[in-house]
């Protein structure tokens, strides 16, 4: 396995010059950055992608997990600039570039059934057809999107209804629709980069945040919160992209190589993440037995579901006809893949 290179943030610009030297289409070493640790879901996908590329070609993939090359905004910029060939980034961050990608933050749009989700992401016309040109406009070739697991709220006080979030400063990604979601839920949404979240919870700058279960364990967020709440409101989604100039410059054979690797990594990762939620929650409870875990009943979820209509309207207001068309197609795709 190629070793990742760690840069100080002050050296990123200088490092970029060295990295950029290898970005031509003929490069044997391709660079791939993602937002999580090597052992997290994005890391599992990246390692399988690397394995497939290297097993079926002479190319090499160099992996850069979270923090190696900066925050999420940094790795996206480096991919658009051609310094990186591949990037895995959640629509939560790309929403500022591609407003329609915020559709994944419309509450209760995505089902909690993991098998249904896996079929949807693989077969969806909205994802596989309609999103591609939107990403291309930003210099990105969308390879695929995949689910990382049901999102859980972690807080310092119990949450069983929307009123429990009143005056709670709740960390959200820098995503306009996610801000609107937590406003509608009754919280005070507080955008923060991930690197500041643990400390923010520790010092009470914020009192809550959301993420899939595996991430709560791997980042030890359970150490600085006391309650985990599953409201069924969302499933964390991420997207794998290539620099479009790089991808377009590949031979047809190498483009197929990349597509095949992305598909193999998708299938592998979906199975992994379906198991990760249960195993990682068990690890959290072993590490902190006093952690309180609540799965909201349908009655308890009712206020959150009522707020979802307001957020959906905000999404259409933000994105216009393009967003409305994608939302309509996603609903059709979800219905088509339900069984």
Curated annotation (Swiss-Prot):
The lineage of its organism: Bacteria, Pseudomonadati, Pseudomonadota, Alphaproteobacteria, Rhodobacterales. L-ectoine binds at residues 36, 171, 211, 215, 236. GO terms for cellular component: periplasmic space. Its main location: periplasm. It holds the Pfam family DctP. It comes from Ruegeria pomeroyi (strain ATCC 700808 / DSM 15171 / DSS-3) (Silicibacter pomeroyi). This is Ectoine/5-hydroxyectoine-binding periplasmic protein UehA. It is found in: Periplasm. One of its GO terms (biological process) is transmembrane transport. Disulfide bonds join 162-303. It comes from the Bacteria. Monomer. The complex comprises the extracytoplasmic solute receptor protein UehA, and the two transmembrane proteins UehB and UehC. Residues 1-20 form the signal peptide. Transport is enhanced in cells that are grown in the presence of ectoine, but not by high-salinity media. The keyword Disulfide bond applies. Part of the tripartite ATP-independent periplasmic (TRAP) transport system UehABC, which imports both ectoine and 5-hydroxyectoine as nutrients, and not as osmoprotectants. UehA binds both ectoine and 5-hydroxyectoine with high specificity and affinity. Keywords: Disulfide bond, Periplasm, Signal, Transport. The keyword Signal applies. Belongs to the bacterial solute-binding protein 7 family.
């Amino acid at each position: 396995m190629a070793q990742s290179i760690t840069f100080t943030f002050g050296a990123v610009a200088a490092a970029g010059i060295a990295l950029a030297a290898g970005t031509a289409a003929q490069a044997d070493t391709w660079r791939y950055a993602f937002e999580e640790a090597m052992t997290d879901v994005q890391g599992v996908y990246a390692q399988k992608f690397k394995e497939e590329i290297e097993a079926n070609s002479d190319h090499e993939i160099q992996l850069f997990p979270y923090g190696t090359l900066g925050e999420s905004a940094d790795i996206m910029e480096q991919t658009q600039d051609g310094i990186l060939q591949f990037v895995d980034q959640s629509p939560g961050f790309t929403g500022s570039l591609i407003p329609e990608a915020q559709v994944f933050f419309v509450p209760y749009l995505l089902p909690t059934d993991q098998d249904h989700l896996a079929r949807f992401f693989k077969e969806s016309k909205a994802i596989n057809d309609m999103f591609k040109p939107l990403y291309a406009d930003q210099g990105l070739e969308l390879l695929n999107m995949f689910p990382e697991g049901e999102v859980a709220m972690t807080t310092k006080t119990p949450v069983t209804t929307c009123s429990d979030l009143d005056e709670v400063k709740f960390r959200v990604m820098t995503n306009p629709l996610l801000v609107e979601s937590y406003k509608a839920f009754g919280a005070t949404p507080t955008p923060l980069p991930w690197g500041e979240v643990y400390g923010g919870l520790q010092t009470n700058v914020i009192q809550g945040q959301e993420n899939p279960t595996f991430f709560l364990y791997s980042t030890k967020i359970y150490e600085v919160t006391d309650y985990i709440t599953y409201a069924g409101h969302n499933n964390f989604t991420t997207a794998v992209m290539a620099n479009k100039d790089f991808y377009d410059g590949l031979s047809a054979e190498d483009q197929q190589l990349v597509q095949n690797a992305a598909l193999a990594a998708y299938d592998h990762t979906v199975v992994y993440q379906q198991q990760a939620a249960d195993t990682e929650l068990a690890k959290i409870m072993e590490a902190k037995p006093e952690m309180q875990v609540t799965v909201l009943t349908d009655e308890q979820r009712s206020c959150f579901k009522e707020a979802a209509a307001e957020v959906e309207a905000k999404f259409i207001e933000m994105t216009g006809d393009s967003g409305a068309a994608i939302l309509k197609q996603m609903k059709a795709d979800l219905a088509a893949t339900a069984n």
